[in-house]
Amino acid sequence: MNIIMKRKPSEPNLWKYILAGIFFGAIIKIFILDILSVKGISMEPAIHDNEKIIVCNLSYGIINPFGNSTFIRWKNAKPGDIVVYFYKNNLVVKRCVAADGDSLEYSSNSGYTLHVGEKNYPLTELQYNLMKNSPCVPRGMILAIGDNFENSIDSRTYGFVAQKNILGKVIFK
């Protein structure tokens, strides 16, 4: 006597789809796009406090998921780009105002000023003394300054930012 058992048609395994969704979501967030909420007014009027931004993590290279730098780099930030990088274990959003090789000029007449192209940025005496010996942006670095430069802690305070430490470019706000 032969017994034939009918197999039930396979039902979709919901857990497979959930795990696949989580996996692909993590890959997208780590390597492709990230949504961040900006804290602070240093980038006003371009980006306001508590505003959400979308960062393309592939703009300059592939991010090292276990560090604060790019693993493989194919492009450098250029002046005008709004970039995201780490400073003291915090993500920072600033505008690249000069890239490697760009000339920097300083003035101490009636206050301290940094001249980059057509733009002038105020400096404190301490910032002036820290920066005045750099006639240009060093190779592999950028000068990153907040658009609201009167209320920004940026490259004028902590120095140039290494291109390899830039994690992405703001593409939408």
Regions picked out by a protein language model, each given a short descriptive name:
Residues 89, 117-118:
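Residue-level detection of beta-strand-connecting loop/turn positions
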Residues 110-117:
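Short polybasic amphipathic segments
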Residues 1-91, 159-173:
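Protein maturation boundaries and topogenic segments
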Residues 39-48, 118, 123, 127-172:
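Acidic/glycine-rich C-terminal interaction modules and beta/coil loop segments
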Residues 104-110:
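Short, solvent-exposed secondary-structure boundary/capping segments
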Residues 93-100:
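Short beta-strand-centered aromatic/proline hotspots
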Residues 60-61, 89-90, 103-104, 149-151:
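Solvent-exposed loop/turn segments at secondary-structure junctions
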Residues 50-51, 81-82, 102, 141, ...:
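Structural motif
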